[in-house]
Amino acid sequence: MSRHFFTSESVSEGHPDKIADQISDAVLDAIIAKDKHARVACETMVKTGVAIISGEVSTNAWVDLEKLTRNVISDIGYTSSDVGFDGATCGIMNLIGQQSPEIAQGVDRSNPEEQGAGDQGLMFGYATNETPTLMPAPLYYSHRLVERQAEARKSGVLPWLRPDAKSQVTFIYEDNKPVAIDTVVLSTQHNPDIKQEDLVSAVMENIINHVLPAELLTEDTKYHINPTGRFVIGGPVGDCGLTGRKIIVDTYGGMARHGGGAFSGKDPSKVDRSAAYAGRYVAKNIVAAGLADRCEIQISYAIGVAEPTSISIDTFGTGSISEERLVEIVREHFDLRPYGITKMLDLLHPMYQQTAAYGHFGREPFEMTVGDDTFTAFSWEKTDKADDLRKAAGL
């Protein structure tokens, strides 16, 4: 029997980098709600008392960027300088400019199916059958811990919590299957009047034991709750936040490879985002079809070129058919050109702020309505291709 450990981390919606991601995606949503064919690349920086919004946009839509930014910050829970940031009073700087026409000429086409990739690059998708969501267990439970932290804070279960938090979970694997949790780390911002011993017991009861299955916890499981002691100063006062700084948290927690491109603030013409979503869709359907226990797909592109420059698949020795045959089946059943991805996953809707905290993958698809627009968020998490893939594989 082989035995190893694997660790993943997550951060809360109040982490400075996640504030930036949520603002960038809120800007994207506001624009795409009015102009589905806008080109958006929005970058945000937050630091003590200020939010700087920059990037490139091509659209005729008007967005009240200041109001939008203030609402995002306040909704997260930053409503007072005592907490470390105040959405109502912080300074907001708008540095957004026009997209370069040289990029547009390489991407835009009269025939939309020939739309070129917005940049070169390589993207990965991954799935594993070790959790019901087909996500790696260490990341899945890390996300659930900080998601529960926000829920306990906002619902009043633990009203002395503040928005900034981080989690980390180490799993023990035996023969590549997760069997137990070795270590749990949870650091959460809090009001100054809560005692450390009270915080530890409340977090243990209302967050950790609320989220982590008892069968995965043992007498040897180690817990580090606010291991440095006080965590009163947090958010953008404690650290500068930037869009795109949590790409491993956003994806697979280090269990799969990453091409390096961030997601938030980018419209679907940017393959950094859309092709990574498509990669997850492909890998998840392969695993859901029973064609592999684990699957990682790499897709690559050249700027201005529609067809992927390469597609490769690794099933880590768990596949029921050859990887070469899997690539053939994927080419037959998935259109991985930029326009094809956008159409296949129905991406031209204002759904992206929903993705900007607690992971872009492993979430349940659900119906959203924004104005007159009704659509499915997290469409890349559907397993509607699994039966077709199984039949194509002859299983």
From Swiss-Prot:
EC number: 2.5.1.6
Amino-acid positions noted as binding L-methionine in the UniProt annotation, renumbered to this chain: 56, 99, 239, 270
Region (Flexible loop): 99-109
Oligomeric form and interacting partners: Homotetramer; dimer of dimers.
GO cellular component, one term: cytoplasm
Lineage, broadest ranks: Bacteria, Pseudomonadati, Pseudomonadota, Gammaproteobacteria, Alteromonadales
Cell compartments where the protein resides: Cytoplasm
Keyword check for Cytoplasm: yes
PROSITE patterns for the chain: ADOMET_SYNTHASE_1, ADOMET_SYNTHASE_2
Keyword Heme attached: no
Family: Belongs to the AdoMet synthase family.
Co-factor remark: Binds 2 divalent ions per subunit.
Signal peptide (UniProt feature, chain positions): none
Entry binding sites for Mg(2+): 17
Keywords assigned: ATP-binding, Cytoplasm, Magnesium, Metal-binding, Nucleotide-binding, One-carbon metabolism, Potassium, Transferase
Pfam families in the cross-refs: S-AdoMet_synt_C (PF02773), S-AdoMet_synt_M (PF02772), S-AdoMet_synt_N (PF00438)
Major location category of this protein: cytoplasm
Molecular function GO terms recorded: ATP binding; magnesium ion binding; methionine adenosyltransferase activity
Pathway given in the UniProt record: Amino-acid biosynthesis; S-adenosyl-L-methionine biosynthesis; S-adenosyl-L-methionine from L-methionine: step 1/1
Binding site for ATP: 15, 164-166, 230-231, 239, 245-246, 262, 266
HAMAP family: S_AdoMet_synth1
GO biological process, one term: one-carbon metabolic process
Name of the protein: S-adenosylmethionine synthase
Function: Catalyzes the formation of S-adenosylmethionine (AdoMet) from methionine and ATP. The overall synthetic reaction is composed of two sequential steps, AdoMet formation and the subsequent tripolyphosphate hydrolysis which occurs prior to release of AdoMet from the enzyme.
Catalytic activity line of the entry: L-methionine + ATP + H2O = S-adenosyl-L-methionine + phosphate + diphosphate
Cofactor: Mg(2+); K(+)
